[in-house]
């Protein structure tokens, strides 16, 4: 295995190649193959970017057909047939069946582009600067998004430039299960001497992926929406990792029955791992002047083609949604079993998550690392999350075959016992 050029030339900022130090050559659905021919089951899926699996054949064919037709690849924000098809599909397959009416902003290819656009739009629309985000939240590493990201590791990497115009509130459960953290937020909003500038918007993940699979309760989300409405504050749902079916619904906020003012999507939005993001906004919030927020890659037509194909294939009825929820119950049960075994053997652990966005909190980054390293040796790719990397985190493809899902869970259970027997 030749890695010298990779180790010598790629920046030290790299991470995943340190955890999984092999050279991969190909992938299909939930399996990756390295250059020595060894297969691995993938419980990482591009950190939630490959909800429909690696090289999904249906989406691959849509991509090949589009390329073969000499379709527009790069067109800035020109009107193209691919864009029209994408917007029509988004409206007819996703938005209208859910009673949602949004305009679409295409800000650039990444999730952090979408977050930057969302928070800037909120400031323009409301004429206020402050944005409220939550403890353990992750929204990106460009300066505006970073200001709303809680993890100190990312916030320290600014060269001394301060992050500004954001205030942090405790996420659901941050102060224990008996405390409703929104009491504190609501108290500050009502106190003119509380020190909190009335925000333009609140940005929140319904399930915090990088923060440790912290799940916002449905009633908590409903109350958050009510507080925002009562105080003329926009509600932004960052659905970049939790969206596109990851929690069992296309939008993760559907479980709570709320209607955000602004939604950010990326990661699995293209369906094929192509860089793609959009911002959904209530029509009356579209305060942009032409060209006021732009980017060279703000309309990736290859991603339009695969995203539309994914929506038609998987979201035209509830068959796929029900299958994701069925698989989620399998993972939940097995994670609960693994957590129980750890607790019985002196390592306090608990299962958490929603849909196929699940984790096992083992209380220590060192313990979680031992489990994931052993799992990799046994042929499973799975990562950790949380402020100290203490949560073993599963983001397997939603399309994973049952036999691969069960085999991956078997590997994880065996690896856990091997690491601590």
From Swiss-Prot:
The modification N6-(pyridoxal phosphate)lysine is found at residue 267. Disulfide bonds: none annotated. Its cofactor is pyridoxal 5'-phosphate. The keyword Membrane does not apply. Its EC number is 2.6.1.76. Pathway: Amine and polyamine biosynthesis; ectoine biosynthesis; L-ectoine from L-aspartate 4-semialdehyde: step 1/3. One of its GO terms (molecular function) is diaminobutyrate-2-oxoglutarate transaminase activity. GO terms for biological process: ectoine biosynthetic process. Pfam families: Aminotran_3 (PF00202). Keywords: Aminotransferase, Pyridoxal phosphate, Transferase. It is an enzyme of class 2 (transferase). Seems to use L-glutamate specifically as the amino group donor to ASA, as it is not active with L-alanine, L-glutamine, L-aspartate and L-lysine, and is only poorly active with L-homoserine. In the reverse reaction, gamma-aminobutyric acid (GABA) and L-ornithine can also be used as amino group donors to 2-oxoglutarate, but with a reduced activity compared to that with DABA. NCBIfam families: dat (TIGR00709), ectoine_ectB (TIGR02407), PRK09264.1 (NF006733). Belongs to the class-III pyridoxal-phosphate-dependent aminotransferase family. This is Diaminobutyrate--2-oxoglutarate transaminase.
